[in-house]
From Swiss-Prot:
<comment type="similarity">
    <text>Belongs to the class-II aminoacyl-tRNA synthetase family. HisZ subfamily.</text>
</comment>
<dbReference type="GO" id="GO:0000105">
    <property type="term" value="P:L-histidine biosynthetic process"/>
</dbReference>
<dbReference type="GO" id="GO:0140096">
    <property type="term" value="F:catalytic activity, acting on a protein"/>
</dbReference>
<dbReference type="GO" id="GO:0016740">
    <property type="term" value="F:transferase activity"/>
</dbReference>
<dbReference type="Pfam" id="PF13393">
    <property type="entry name" value="tRNA-synt_His"/>
</dbReference>
<dbReference type="InterPro" id="IPR045864">
    <property type="entry name" value="aa-tRNA-synth_II/BPL/LPL"/>
</dbReference>
<dbReference type="InterPro" id="IPR004516">
    <property type="entry name" value="HisRS/HisZ"/>
</dbReference>
<comment type="pathway">
    <text>Amino-acid biosynthesis; L-histidine biosynthesis; L-histidine from 5-phospho-alpha-D-ribose 1-diphosphate: step 1/9.</text>
</comment>
<dbReference type="InterPro" id="IPR041715">
    <property type="entry name" value="HisRS-like_core"/>
</dbReference>
<keyword id="KW-0368">Histidine biosynthesis</keyword>
<comment type="function">
    <text>Required for the first step of histidine biosynthesis. May allow the feedback regulation of ATP phosphoribosyltransferase activity by histidine.</text>
</comment>
<comment type="subunit">
    <text>Heteromultimer composed of HisG and HisZ subunits.</text>
</comment>
<keyword id="KW-0028">Amino-acid biosynthesis</keyword>
<dbReference type="GO" id="GO:0005737">
    <property type="term" value="C:cytoplasm"/>
</dbReference>
<protein>
    <recommendedName>
        <fullName>ATP phosphoribosyltransferase regulatory subunit</fullName>
    </recommendedName>
</protein>
<dbReference type="GO" id="GO:0006427">
    <property type="term" value="P:histidyl-tRNA aminoacylation"/>
</dbReference>
<dbReference type="InterPro" id="IPR006195">
    <property type="entry name" value="aa-tRNA-synth_II"/>
</dbReference>
Length: 419
């Protein structure tokens, strides 16, 4: 036998009964939340051309993508994300559809990640995208949906941190940072590295006030009062407009009754080339990584030949499952209701009974006896099946209530009429 035949590659896993039930239940609740807002589901191909993800606007290093060739020598990838294909669809197949266009999706994506911290090379991504609306209302709706999605699966203790990349871009413009330093300082701010930010600022002759504002981005975050603190400063029009956008979004979220879940972090600057306005991330207690993230990305569709404002969010189902486990939230897989067992001579009647009970919305397994009824009892106990229906002949049936240790004789008609 080949050495690797019994293993799975790094970063992928088998999902067995209990975990798979939990995953499907979470997906069902998420899907229902998306539909309740009018975001209907689409599917995109698992395999895409490499070019779809190779634009400067996207943020997927080519070494993180799973690449291979088709029969014509063209480079293909297993999709590392679903937002980008949604942008492709909008610019091509839905080019003339009335806006805003509201999409939802749940599907597997593939990236070479550092395995650990809940990260996998294959994981299920769920999300929504709204294209064609540049308003604060659309940003707030997306954030509200993110909050209500987490609530729908049972999470209670979490925060959505809201940022706005245009605030920093306005400061960088005023300071005259080079493109190289904009990239470097934004990374330091996002990591809350005060010393790293100071090292870059020391290379520029900027006002004391502007310097202090930039430094505050590494440490001033939390309640909505952060907005007021930054508004006191003398900032340019671009940064002021960004602050006002955040204010309006927070005000709308108050109207949704969701302000308790919101905090502010204007130093959230992970994807400056991709994000064009509001950004946000979701965190919960005991989990050191975001369980969801979202942003406005108005430039993405332009790489496919159409200008279209856009906003959305996505989450990783496996990370959400980890967060829920740490929060003590469980989904118990329901057991089979009854085991219908029989000798082969009574097979037809057993199948008839099993099918009739299934039509009554019961979960029924069948079991062929070869070593007597104790064989069925042992099997039922191992699978936590509460009852056994033993078909002795066409109209002689013994019912075993294993949980309450009760045995009774019954008939075909009585059995079906009592369920």
């Amino acid at each position: 036998m080949s050495r690797w035949k019994i293993y799975t590659p790094d970063g992928v896993q088998d999902i067995l009964f209990d975990e798979c039930y939990k995953k499907r239940e979470i997906e069902k609740r998420i899907r229902n939340t998306f539909r309740s807002y009018g975001y209907y589901e689409i599917e995109t191909p698992t395999i895409e051309f490499f070019d779809v993800f190779s634009s400067e606007i996207e943020h997927f290093p080519q070494e993180s993508m799973v690449k291979f060739f088709d029969q014509k020598g063209r480079i293909l990838v297993l999709r590392p994300d679903i937002t980008v294909p949604v942008a492709r669809i909008t610019a091509t197949k839905n080019r003339d559809v009335q806006v805003p266009i509201k999409y939802s999706y749940i599907g597997n994506v593939f990236r070479f990640n550092e395995v650990g911290g809940g990260r996998q090379n294959e994981f299920t991504q769920a999300g929504v995208e709204m294209l064609g609306d540049s308003s604060s209302e659309s940003d707030a709706e997306i954030i509200a949906m993110a909050i209500n999605t987490l609530k729908s699966v049972g999470l209670k203790e979490f925060k959505i941190e809201i940022g706005q990349v245009e605030f920093f871009k306005g400061l960088a413009e005023e300071a005259g940072f080079s493109n190289e330093d904009i990239d470097a300082i934004s990374k330091q701010i996002d990591k809350k590295d005060l010393v790293g930010v100071e090292e870059i600022l020391n290379r520029y002759d900027i006002s004391t006030e502007l310097r202090e504002i930039v430094l505050k981005l590494t440490g001033l975050f939390g309640s909505v009062d952060v907005i007021k603190e930054f508004k006191k400063a003398s900032i340019n029009g671009r940064s002021l407009k960004a602050i006002e956008n955040v204010e309006e979004v927070v005000s709308i979220l108050c109207d949704y009754g969701l302000s308790e879940y919101v905090s502010i972090d204007l130093g959230m600057l992970k994807s400056l080339n991709y994000d064009t306005g509001i950004t946000f991330r979701g965190f919960t207690n005991g989990v050191g990584f975001p369980i969801l993230s979202g942003a406005r990305y108005d430039n993405l569709t332009s790489s496919f030949g159409k200008e279209c404002p856009a906003t959305g969010f996505s989450l990783r189902i496996n990370m959400l499952m980890t967060a829920m486990e740490k929060a003590g939230h469980t989904f118990e897989r329901p057991s089979v209701d009854s085991l219908v067992c029989y000798e082969k001579t009574n097979r037809k009647r057993a199948i008839e009974i099993a099918e009739a009970l299934r039509k009554q919305d019961m979960k029924i397994e069948t079991f062929v006896l070869t070593k007597g009824i104790d064989q069925a009892k042992k099997y039922a106990a191992s699978k936590k099946i509460g009852g056994i229906i033993y078909i002795r002949d066409n109209d002689k049936i013994t019912v075993y209530d294993i949980k309450n240790n009760i045995t009774e004789e019954t008939s075909f008609d009585t059995l079906l009429n009592n369920q």
